[in-house]
From Swiss-Prot:
It is an enzyme of class 3 (hydrolase). The active site is at E11, D196. It comes from Staphylococcus aureus (strain Mu50 / ATCC 700699). This is 5'-methylthioadenosine/S-adenosylhomocysteine nucleosidase. GO terms for cellular component: cytosol. The keyword RNA-binding does not apply. The gene is mtnN.
Length: 228
């Protein structure tokens, strides 16, 4: 069983509509769609936006469906200036950009008693990288950071870049999903696409290009599923 998590309806609808033998259940106001995609058993959930929603949905998915791997799909704001709308983002590490326990000796972004970063599954990273090469998509592997804020100003962007110079993208769920997977020992990878450039025009760009980002990320996830 392969678990796929997206925060918004636009981020999961494309994949959900491709499921055969579709079945739907709801647990704690979270909808889960099970079926067959590329001859593989999958469960897709729309988690809702933000870290708590993501953690709840991931926990429910793991407990009820026992997935072998989890893929987080959707959109993100680019922090790397070489990225453009529609480019595919593949996580190697994910971190929180809004966690601060430095007073107790932890690194900025680190939750106490948790790793500095949550590492994606190397085999999954390799498979996604192969998929995007085959599809001739522009993609980048790197650090994705998460927090409970939509990054829509130059000031917000600069603050994150100062704290995490190597971060390529920012969004609102991936690290919570990753932390949950870490605690349940489930391999994960984040496969998203750029919807905006996390700057003063981010809100307008996000609304205009969310669909393009959803198509790019969904295409990649569908191809990845066929390889698992």
């Amino acid at each position: 069983m392969i678990g796929i998590i997206g925060a918004m309806e636009e981020e999961v609808t494309i994949l959900k509509n491709k499921l055969t033998q579709l079945s739907e259940i709801s647990v704690a106001h979270v909808k889960f769609y099970t079926g067959i995609l590329k001859d593989r058993e999958v469960v897709i959930t729309q988690s809702g936006i933000g870290k708590v929603n993501a953690a709840i949905s991931t926990t429910l998915l793991i407990n009820k469906f026992k997935p072998d791997v989890i893929i987080n799909t959707g959109s993100a704001g680019a922090l790397d200036e070489s990225l453009n709308v529609g480019d595919v983002l593949i996580s190697d590490d994910v971190k929180y950009h809004d966690a601060d326990a430095t007073a107790f000796g932890y690194e900025y972004g680190q939750i106490p008693q948790m790793p500095v970063a949550f590492q994606s599954s190397k085999p999954l990273i390799e498979k996604v990288s192969q998929v995007v090469q085959q599809q001739q998509l522009t993609a980048k592997v790197g650090l994705i950071v998460s927090g409970d804020s939509f990054i829509g100003s130059v000031e917000q962007r600069q603050k994150i870049k100062k704290a995490f110079p190597n971060a390529m993208a920012v969004e609102m769920e991936a690290t919570a999903i990753a932390q949950t997977c870490y605690q349940f020992n489930v391999p994960f990878v984040v496969v998203r696409a750029v919807s905006d450039l996390a700057n003063g025009e981010a809100e307008m760009s996000f609304e205009a290009f969310l669909e393009k980002a959803a198509v790019s990320s969904s295409q990649t996830v569908e191809a990845l599923v066929s390889q698992l």
